[in-house]
Amino acid sequence: MFNVHSVEIEWAGRPLKLETGKIARQADGAVLASYGETVVLATVVSAKSPKPGQDFFPLTVNYQEKTYAAGKIPGGYFKREGRPSEKETLVSRLIDRPIRPLFPEGYKNDTQVVVTVIQHDLENDPDVLSMVAASAALTLSGVPFMGPVGGARVGYINGEYVLNPHLDEMDESVLDLVVAGTQDAVLMVESEAKELNEDVMLGAVMFGHRGFQPVIDAIIKLAEVAAKEPREFEPEDHSALEAEMLSIAEAELRDAYKITQKADRYTAVDAVKAKVKAHFFPEGAEPKYTNEVIGAVFKHLQAKIVRWNILDTKSRIDGRDLETVRAIVSEVGILPRTHGSALFTRGETQAIVVATLGTGEDEQYVDSLTGMYKERFLLHYNFPPYSVGETGRMGSPGRREIGHGKLAWRAIRPMLPSPEQFPYTLRVVSEITESNGSSSMATVCGTSLALMDAGVPLAKPVAGIAMGLILEGERFAVLSDILGDEDHLGDMDFKVAGTEAGITSLQMDIKIAGITEEIMKVALAQAQNGRKHILGEMANAITEGRSQLGEFAPRIEVMTIPVDKIREVIGSGGKVIREIVEKTGAKINIEDDGTIKIASASGKEIEAARKWIHSIVAEPEIGVVYEGTVVKTADFGAFVNFFGSRDGLVHISQLAVDRVAKTQDVVKEGDKVWVKLMGFDERGKVRLSMKVVDQATGKEIVGDKKAEGDAAAE
């Protein structure tokens, strides 16, 4: 019934198995992949023909995690998986980026890749395995795909590169880098690092590239016995059309791309495009080409002309040379009622970034396959259509917004203070108000500024820069701080973020073979210069976290109590802690280890709550004077409530220096009095004295030896 083929290799100390022919046989390609005991199913389906009028390649990648894979039942009312989680969205993008460039130009058939995690061993992250499985499924499917692609994770532990570290090993690693590519070229890099230099980062990329070669060999071996017949696909040859269009439009298009202002340049390009269309769609005649073909060839021609201009003249669309970064303006404190804010403008790219400080209650609970955890740093990136002068959909964030936000998050996170040093939950929102290239890196810069404005003690400021690279034969040009128009015409786009000392995040997308390690080294060195220049410009606004929090930010005080006292602070059914919160107005968060965080915008509220908790858990000290309230009087003395909920007896002989005939002559119920703790009797009862304390000032009476002696004798 089944025609099963499989291949198995040992990879980084664990078995990797790829199997096809048993599951999902109606898909064009399906591979069941396992690594260790983590298992994913990857499927590929591609339509037999493109939709009429389709002018782009509709590739969709869906990565999904099933909770049963880790022996869990989903939370929530419906108890089933719902909308994609942040990780599912990010891994979908991670798979998409290296495979998309390997489909032939002109292939426009609707194509869907679905990768499902069906078992998780809690040791091997399924993201890299999913990339491998998707690549294998595409290679077997018969769909035109110039793969296969391999992928690997690289850690850096104790100065050594580690291939595919286990999840628990990642806690020790100062690098989390995922790299994907073919036998000949690196195609994609995604990473987070703790201030590593360019050589270490590039070394990790090349180490990973070498590390996944056995995987590519295994996919090829499987394809030799299990691949379907390749589909016939002959890309349309538009070279004659392009040559004709070039003769009509080259001069005017070159002139248009000398205009430095974006809006004026677009107007000029549109005029050239209109002229081209008028030529190929004459009135009264049957057009030779479709509107989609003319548009695609014109777009290709635009890219060619810009590339030629840059390589020939070393001058960019906006008049800059290859290394110059656009003019930068950094401002902080632009929204004084927020906790921290910044406006970062670089050329025609601009971001308003706002930081908000919260308490432990504001941490985000993340329910992942590996277990529930709390996230104290949140970064949300918004890209409204007006930022590029367009209308469009507004609503929940798309994949791009989630991906850009996570890139900036990775760049900033290594520089954040520890929870012990700064016990706040941090939320940053980046509103892109203008965009002409690299809004994600503007978010990195703006986030660094806004956090410092909020008083967050970042280890160092962080800046980011987007780079491009153009390669034609032996000639290449590296572009610093690329424009939106330069974003798609390059052969390598990469974004680097970090401090003066090193890189905290690196993202690369390489579209062609031939970009060598040496070329990447040159590109990273140029990016380092650009990053340091941007950091210098940011320093004009702020260089470190403010010493004081903003006026409207909450204050948090941390105290620690014995674990066995937690129940007393919480009280039966939470009665005590609720009363403290209601009476003081402070927010209180109690951890299992006895750490208590008290938060409020008012210092008085924090102090009141702290004293209350202290009075519950602390023991009164002999010889210390306390303020108390008389709660009951008797013939033999008065009972005084002091030190929170403690009660003690002031014997009638200790009420005053002079002899007292009747307790009520000195105190009445409800009176505020000062008492000194003299000790405990043989039954452990508290002994208090009023006569050794000045009741007007609350200070102990010094030098009254008789009073002291009398008190001690009682």
UniProtKB/Swiss-Prot annotation:
Keywords: Cytoplasm, Magnesium, Metal-binding, Nucleotidyltransferase, RNA-binding, Transferase. Residues 623-691 form the S1 motif domain. Pfam families: KH_1 (PF00013), PNPase (PF03726), RNase_PH (PF01138), RNase_PH_C (PF03725), S1 (PF00575). GO terms for molecular function: 3'-5'-RNA exonuclease activity; magnesium ion binding; polyribonucleotide nucleotidyltransferase activity; RNA binding. It catalyses: RNA(n+1) + phosphate = RNA(n) + a ribonucleoside 5'-diphosphate. Its main location: cytoplasm. One of its GO terms (cellular component) is cytosol. Its cofactor is Mg(2+). Its EC number is 2.7.7.8. GO terms for biological process: mRNA catabolic process; RNA processing. Mg(2+) binds at D487, D493. It is an enzyme of class 2 (transferase). It is found in: Cytoplasm. Residues 554-613 form the KH domain. InterPro entries: ExoRNase_PH_dom1, ExoRNase_PH_dom2, ExoRNase_PH_dom2_sf, KH_dom, KH_dom_type_1, KH_dom_type_1_sf, NA-bd_OB-fold, PNPase. Involved in mRNA degradation. Catalyzes the phosphorolysis of single-stranded polyribonucleotides processively in the 3'- to 5'-direction. PANTHER family: POLYRIBONUCLEOTIDE NUCLEOTIDYLTRANSFERASE, POLYRIBONUCLEOTIDE NUCLEOTIDYLTRANSFERASE 1, MITOCHONDRIAL. Belongs to the polyribonucleotide nucleotidyltransferase family. NCBIfam families: polynuc_phos, PRK11824.1. This is Polyribonucleotide nucleotidyltransferase. The lineage of its organism: Bacteria, Pseudomonadati, Pseudomonadota, Alphaproteobacteria, Hyphomicrobiales. The gene is pnp.
